[in-house]
């Protein structure tokens, strides 16, 4: 019995160490994609977890003009906005722009590859991470509705007036991007601005001046 107990104990320790090593490798793969992440004031860890790993809540928003400014900066090789707010079956819908998929790896080759389809072209087209496609069973041309919030919660508001259509499915990357749904930042703006106008009309109040200024949750960057 002692020998069996030792063997089981050693096996458990080895399994934990292997899982830890694999987790560290996965975290390093994600962190190595970007050099800088810009976001609202708050915890730097929370900012990275929410915008890179799709795990935590965002720290706040930035004006979209900040993204355009970074995009023009000669020190920036690549940049892309990240807009959060909705999910589908627990997978976050990430609003961004087409250059998101132009991200190069550290050898200068494209990081993202399409297993099927293409990048989004219309406002409510989306690209699925590999895990999203395999878990949900969504295929090219399928449509679905996003749900308000970053996680799946019973009774959460479903945006039934704004159907998404799948235009592409990414090849596995071994990163958190496999667990995300990528759509246009413009679609995120349209959904939530429409809701704000509706809620204001119901409450009999006007939107605050400047409320509808374009914003982004975070900005991902790779430097030259």
Which residues does each PLM region occupy?
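Soluble periplasmic/extracytoplasmic beta-strand elements of cell-envelope proteins
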Residues: 35-39, 92-95, 125-127, 143-145, ...
């Amino acid at each position: 019995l002692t020998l069996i107990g030792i063997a089981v104990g050693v096996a458990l320790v080895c399994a934990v160490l292997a899982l830890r090593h694999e987790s560290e490798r996965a975290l390093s793969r994600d962190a190595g994609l970007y050099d800088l992440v810009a976001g609202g004031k708050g915890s730097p860890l929370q900012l990275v977890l929410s915008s890179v790993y799709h795990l935590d809540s965002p720290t706040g928003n930035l004006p979209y003009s900040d993204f355009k400014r970074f995009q023009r900066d000669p020190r920036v090789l690549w940049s892309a906005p990240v807009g959060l707010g909705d999910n589908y079956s627990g997978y976050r819908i990430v609003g961004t722009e087409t250059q998101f998929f132009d991200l190069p790896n550290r050898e200068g080759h494209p990081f993202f590859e399409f297993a099927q389809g293409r990048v989004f072209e219309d406002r409510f087209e989306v690209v699925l991470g590999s895990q999203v496609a395999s878990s949900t069973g969504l295929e090219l041309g399928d449509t679905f509705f996003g749900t308000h919030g970053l996680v799946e919660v019973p009774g959460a508001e479903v945006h039934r007036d704004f159907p998404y259509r799948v235009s592409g499915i990414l090849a596995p990357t071994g990163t958190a991007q496999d667990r995300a749904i990528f759509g246009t930042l413009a679609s995120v703006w349209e959904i939530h601005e429409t809701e704000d106008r509706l809620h204001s009309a119901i409450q009999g109040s006007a939107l605050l001046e400047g409320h509808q200024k374009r914003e982004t949750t975070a900005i991902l960057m790779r430097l030259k």
